[in-house]
């Protein structure tokens, strides 16, 4: 998949107000409220904005933080990192490589084998599950 370039107006038409606030304006959903924070379903988490495959449920774990947490992305080229100095903190923001949607942040307090915690807003994701007939579905 190549780079996705859309105007703010196009994103506003395609996303819910909450999805737009989080993915395009770098917002954060309240902890323990997002659709996927406690989901145990198996599948692939894709970018809500462009559909790029980002994380496998095999890398998801319960970090106790209230947001979906993963110890690694599907591969190193699907997510870009940027320094985030907002809110009086120094953090590393993670964005979708293809459309630059704000996903969340990555922290160095995760489990092995990476020691990383990709803390992601549910509104930035969509879970693509596998049905018994192996066809991909979006719940």
Swiss-Prot record:
The lineage is: Bacteria, Pseudomonadati, Pseudomonadota, Gammaproteobacteria, Moraxellales
Q: Which InterPro entries match?
A: Met_Sox_Rdtase_MsrB (IPR028427), Met_Sox_Rdtase_MsrB_dom (IPR002579), Mss4-like_sf (IPR011057)
**What protein is this chain from?**
Peptide methionine sulfoxide reductase MsrB
What are the protein's UniProt keywords?
A: Metal-binding, Oxidoreductase, Zinc
UniProt GO MF annotations: peptide-methionine (R)-S-oxide reductase activity; zinc ion binding
What would be one Gene Ontology cellular-component term for the protein?
cytoplasm
The processes (GO biological process) annotated in the record are: protein repair; response to oxidative stress
EC number(s) on record?
A: 1.8.4.12
User: Could you say which enzyme class this protein belongs to?
Assistant: oxidoreductase
Task: Enumerate the PROSITE patterns for this protein.
Answer: MSRB
* Entries under HAMAP family matching the protein: MsrB
Q: Which residues form the MsrB domain?
A: 8-130
Q: Which PANTHER family match?
A: METHIONINE SULFOXIDE REDUCTASE (PTHR10173), METHIONINE-R-SULFOXIDE REDUCTASE B1 (PTHR10173:SF52)
- Reaction(s) catalyzed by this protein? L-methionyl-[protein] + [thioredoxin]-disulfide + H2O = L-methionyl-(R)-S-oxide-[protein] + [thioredoxin]-dithiol
Could you say which residues bind Zn(2+) here? 47, 50, 96, 99
Which residues does UniProt mark as catalytic? 119
Q: Which organism is it from?
A: Acinetobacter baumannii (strain ATCC 17978 / DSM 105126 / CIP 53.77 / LMG 1025 / NCDC KC755 / 5377)
Name any cofactors this protein relies on. Zn(2+)
Cofactor note, please? Binds 1 zinc ion per subunit. The zinc ion is important for the structural integrity of the protein.
Similarity comment text for this entry:
Belongs to the MsrB Met sulfoxide reductase family.
